[in-house]
Curated annotation (Swiss-Prot):
Annotated Pfam families: RBFA
Entry-linked SUPFAM superfamilies: Ribosome-binding factor A, RbfA (SSF89919)
Main location: cytoplasm
The keyword Cytoplasm is assigned to this record: yes
Subunit structure: Monomer. Binds 30S ribosomal subunits, but not 50S ribosomal subunits or 70S ribosomes.
Protein encoded by which gene: rbfA
HAMAP family per record: RbfA
Protein's UniProt name: Ribosome-binding factor A
Family: Belongs to the RbfA family.
MF terms in GO: ribosomal small subunit binding
UniProt KW keywords: Cytoplasm, Ribosome biogenesis
Length: 133
């Protein structure tokens, strides 16, 4: 079992190398339909599996097409990682879509609209209140 420092270093190295591959070496047209960025890489403790989280900007169709292209490019990415990194065994690579940015944007929109909703409720409560005379 690798130490957590080694796992962290391998993870950051994979992130850097895969980002470079996305920019320059993956020739699949489907990968280019949406703007893709690597947000995080999780490597298992035994360095045998790597989950690569990608954020894709574009329409839902472009996202689906890009993910299909990334899944088909996974063997190429693994082979390239094996040639570039000095590891005993190259980890199995899987691409997963990272939706945290979308969720964060949705939460920010809800929080920004919250003061307006509270102000509207306060006005409705003031209008429906009983007058004491």
């Amino acid at each position: 079992m690798a130490t957590s420092r080694r796992v962290s270093r391998v993870s950051s190295l994979i992130k850097r190398e895969v980002s470079q591959m996305l920019l320059h070496e993956i020739k699949d047209d489907r990968v280019g339909t949406g703007m893709v960025s690597v947000t995080e890489v999780e490597v298992s403790g035994d360095l045998q599996h790597a989950k690569i989280f990608v954020s894709i900007y574009g329409s839902p169709e472009a996202k689906a097409s890009t993910m299909a292209g990334l899944h088909s490019a996974a063997p190429f990415v693994r082979r390239e990682l094996g040639q570039r990194m000095r590891l005993r065994r190259t980890p199995e690579v899987s691409f997963l879509e990272d939706r945290s940015l979308e969720r964060g944007d949705k939460i920010l929109n809800l929080l920004n609209n919250l003061p307006q909703a509270i102000a509207t409720e306060d006005l409705e409560d003031d209008d429906s209140g009983l007058a004491l005379d």
